[in-house]
Regions:
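Residue-level detector of Asp-centered blade-edge/turn motifs that repeat once per structural unit
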Residues: 1-5, 42-45, 83-86, 128-131
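Short, compositionally biased segments
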Residues: 3, 11-13
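Conserved beta-propeller blade signature
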Residues: 7-10, 47-50, 88-91, 133-136
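Surface-exposed loop/turn elements that mediate protein-protein interactions on large endomembrane-trafficking
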Residues: 17-19
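Residue-level "micro-hotspots" composed of small/polar
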Residues: 29-38, 54, 67-82, 92-170
Length: 170
């Protein structure tokens, strides 16, 4: 699921572990007793992102502070999670992909109108490629998010065209 400092992190259905090479042992970092872990990832700043049936939780490992993340559309179920090279958290749900920028506290939602076909995204088939593209797989296929294409934050200008001119009724 990722690395923080020099430690690789792993998860099962209720625990997140870090592997300590020096001690040759796994240490439990987070335990989700009442919330099954569907997907998890860790960023370079030490924020652990855990997706479960009751929503997203982020744990700041340096301070051990834990807080929920509310999705803008009220959805609670995230089944796929990956963090790109820029720190954007990509989350897959039923037919929707969320891109969350934690620095700006800003969401972008991608759905069928953006080319994301209905898909039940899965936790394991996720990849951030060396070129920055994001790949998220599900039961209905694979989605590639081309990071070279930037979404327009400013809508294109409206252009008006004259269709007909009438002078004194003619």
């Amino acid at each position: 699921m990722g690395k923080y400092r020099t430690y690789p992190f792993f998860h099962d259905r209720s625990n997140v572990f870090q592997y300590n090479k020096e001690k040759n042992e796994y240490e439990t970092i987070a335990y989700e007793k009442n919330n099954q872990i569907l997907a998890a990832s860790i960023d370079t700043l030490g924020t652990l992102w855990i997706a479960g049936p009751n929503g997203i939780t982020r744990i700041y490992l340096p301070s051990n502070r834990k807080e929920p993340l509310k999705l803008p559309d009220g959805n609670d179920v995230i089944t796929s999670l990956v963090i790109d090279h820029e720190g954007i958290v990509w989350m897959g749900s039923l037919g929707i992909i969320y891109a969350y920028n934690p620095q700006k506290n800003h969401f972008v939602i991608y759905n069928e109108m953006d080319g994301v076909l209905p898909n039940d995204f899965l936790a394991k088939p996720v990849l951030v490629a060396s070129d920055g593209n994001i790949y998220m797989g599900g039961s209905e296929g694979l989605v590639r998010i081309n990071k070279a294409l930037k979404s327009a934050s400013i809508p294109p200008p409206i252009t008006l065209e004259l269709q007909e001119v009438s002078l004194n009724g003619t």
